[in-house]
Amino acid sequence: MMKLSTMATGLASEDVINSLIKNWAHDEETIRLWRASSNFVIAYSKDEEHYFLRFSFEQEKSIEHIQAELEYMSYLNANHYPCVTPVVSLNGNYIEATQSPEGMYYAVVFKAAQGKSLDENLTELQFEDWGKALGALHRLSEAYEPVSKKRGDWQDVLNGMASILQRHHEKEAIVELEHLIKELQAIPVLKSNYGLIHYDFQLDNLFYEDDTRI
């Protein structure tokens, strides 16, 4: 989840949205806000095809992080896992950027996934397929070796927390964090117990096709 201050700024700035979406062909009258959570997401259409513009503030998600995401998604598609695909911009890029008074924003566009959204009233078969899809994703993640872009890990997150605590002189919290880091570092890191997972594999992020059951 992004900072509330970042969310408020991003939602209030049409200039940022206009500056980013102009890099992809679109029908102006179809643009609408889809959501603002860990990213800003704008839904739009072009010639009756549906797309999503996803953008984020540089302090929330670096360009290196986004490049690593796209590399992983390319790996999933190459291994026949159903995953949305990024759309090349009019400039020939997968990632576009725009500078604003508060900093840089990075954007990617994805073609809308096939299938339908599911509500919480799943059938037994759909529950089974949901679990199979997550299991297949984690099996692929277990074998995944980044080619060029390695995503940040838990140590990067905790190091970021440490820098914030030190800045605010939270001595007791710093001691507790140091204990936590030592405990986590003592856990053996194996392919069977450590790797990339999907932390938000919920219905909002899934589309289901009845005929293929994926």
Q: How should each PLM-predicted stretch be described?
A:
Residues 1-90, 209-212:
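Conserved NTP-binding catalytic cores of kinases and kinase-like/nucleotidyltransferase enzymes
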Residues 20-28, 178-189:
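Short Pro/Gly-enriched beta-strand edge/turn motifs at strand-loop
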Residues 29-30, 95-99, 184-193:
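Short, P/G- and charge-enriched loop/turn segments at secondary-structure junctions
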Residues 37-48, 52, 182-214:
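Active-site acidic catalytic loop and adjacent metal/ATP-binding pocket
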Residues 46-145:
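ATP-binding pocket architecture of kinase catalytic cores
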Residues 105-108, 156, 179:
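Generic alpha-helical secondary structure signal
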Residues 120-171, 192-194:
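A cross-family kinase active-site recognition segment
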Residues 158-178, 203-211:
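Contiguous, function-dense segments enriched for cysteine-driven chemistry
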